[in-house]
A protein has these predicted regions:
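Conserved, well-structured ligand/cofactor-binding cores
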Residues: 1-467
């Protein structure tokens, strides 16, 4: 064991631990979610990138000796390589606006830098977590900047997975292009369409979300490095904000910009609110699609049964032979969680006071969780459901021609009153719309067949003068 001290006194730290006393206190204070920082390595790596950029800027300004800078930069590089993930053990939800997370990073980097300099862990007179690793910084600029970088990177993975799901939907749209089915509004028979049109609509609605996610993720490119505590830049040199932002842009390969007003930027969480809203919107659309898949596959004998979902597992402990739509159900539940996370982000953002929002840890946790869950859910939906969907083509077609909704297609040719009468008679007698129209002599068979041609019913067509 080694002894470390802080404002509150001394504590024993395991000799082999790279974290220090402030991390230890955070572990003891915040046993909240059981979800530790190492489960979101993207935030760890972003923090190390921030510390690298700060060290470079401080070296450039003559505030950090080159030997110390080199040790800190190498330690950060090892953190980014994932060598110390297990040392990042603070809870994702914590008081202090992210100070515990920031200090966890400062201590790990400082202790590794000490080893590289030939010193023992805890010999902070040679490389100090606050005086050197956190030089010219505050949690209030370093932490939100790291969160933004990590979320921006996470958005790339999210949209990449979304692209794959869109492609899978579009492939099914082509596969099912010739399958006629009944469209429905308010769960009642409406007018015919193709099953391919159904899946193409899914592809298009999801495609819209790529642009919206990317637009809102771009808000993360404005950062407040150099703001330090509240945005006034106390304890940083003139020009530091510009230097550290330039270095961080180079390190991350991202075009970051310094906020025009650092006081405003330090207290504002609007970018998180906007991005969370776009993530929620994607979740809502995915859930609606999964509702449709469950409904269209209902049955197999007493439901709609237009499509078959791949059977994944036995569905009941009491009903033999039952197979449930477990993959869409899981995606529905993911969407519910993401929608709840969006509300958390909204409430936490609203609760900010004066010059700082102290609730950024739960905002970050919610958004990282939403990104990860949606990535996993979309991959699961694509691989274990959508790609294996098959159609019951004959059943789909039979339902169209047995549906009273078919009367809408002949409405322009026979008139609304006659069409209404046909619908009422079909409902009362059980006869088909097709047979009743021929029986009443309203149209010739040739004309009726032309109107009820799948191409005519599923796309706009030229109407005759009498129509």
């Amino acid at each position: 064991m080694r002894i470390e001290h802080d404002l509150l006194g001394e504590r024993e730290i395991p000799e082999d631990a790279y974290y220090g006393i402030q991390t230890l206190r955070a572990i003891e204070n915040f046993s909240i979610t059981g979800i530790k920082l190492f489960l979101y390595p993207q935030l760890i790596y972003a923090l190390a990138q921030v510390k690298t950029a700060a060290a470079r800027a401080n070296r450039d300004m003559g505030l950090l000796p080159d030997t110390l800078y080199q040790a800190i930069e190498k330690a950060c590089a090892e953190v980014i390589a994932g060598k110390f993930n297990g040392e990042f053990i603070v809870d994702m939800v914590q008081g202090g606006a992210g100070t515990s997370t920031n200090m966890n990073a400062n201590e790990v980097i400082a202790n590794r830098a000490l080893e590289l300099l030939g010193h023992k862990k805890g010999e902070y007179s040679y490389c100090h977590p606050n005086n050197h690793v956190n030089l010219s910084q505050s949690t209030n600029d370093a932490y939100p900047t790291a969160v933004k970088i990590a979320l921006h990177d996470g958005n790339k993975k999210l949209t990449a997975e979304l692209e794959k799901l869109i492609q899978a939907m579009r492939k099914k749209a082509h596969e099912f292009a010739g399958i006629l089915k009944m469209g429905r509004t308010q769960l009642q028979d409406a007018v015919p369409m193709t099953l391919g049109q159904t899946f193409e609509a899914y592809a298009v609605t999801l495609e819209e979300e790529i642009q919206r996610l990317n637009e809102n993720a771009c808000l993360f490119l404005e950062i407040n490095m150099g703001a330090t505590a509240i945005g006034t830049g106390i304890n940083s040199e003139p020009g530091y904000a510009e230097k550290v932002t330039a270095h961080l842009s180079e390190i991350t390969g991202t075009s970051l910009v310094s906020a025009p007003n650092l006081i405003e930027a330090t207290q504002d969480t609007g970018s998180f609110v906007m991005y969370s809203s776009s993530v929620k919107r994607l979740a809502v659309k995915l859930s609606k699609i999964c509702n449709d898949l469950r409904l269209l596959s209902s049955g197999p004998r007493c439901g709609i049964n237009e499509i078959n979902l791949p059977p994944m597992q036995p569905g009941s402990s009491i009903m033999p032979g039952k197979v449930n739509p477990v993959i869409p159900e899981a995606v529905n539940q993911t969407a519910f969680k993401v929608i709840g996370n969006d509300l958390t982000v909204t409430l936490a953002s609203e609760a900010g006071q004066l010059e700082l929002n102290v609730f950024e840890p739960v905002i970050a946790f919610s958004l990282f969780q939403s990104q990860d869950m949606l990535c996993n859910a979309m991959a699961t939906l694509r691989k274990r459901c959508v790609e294996g969907i098959t159609a019951n083509a004959e059943h789909c077609r039979n339902m169209v021609y047995n549906s009273i909704g078919l009367v809408t297609a002949v409405n322009p040719a026979i008139g609304y009153e006659a069409a209404t009468d046909i619908a009422k008679t079909a409902l009362k007698t059980g006869k088909s719309v097709y047979d009743l129209i021929l029986e009443k002599g309203l149209l010739t068979k040739e004309r009726l067949d032309d109107i009820l041609n799948p191409e005519s019913m599923t796309h706009p067509r030229k109407l005759t003068a009498t129509e």
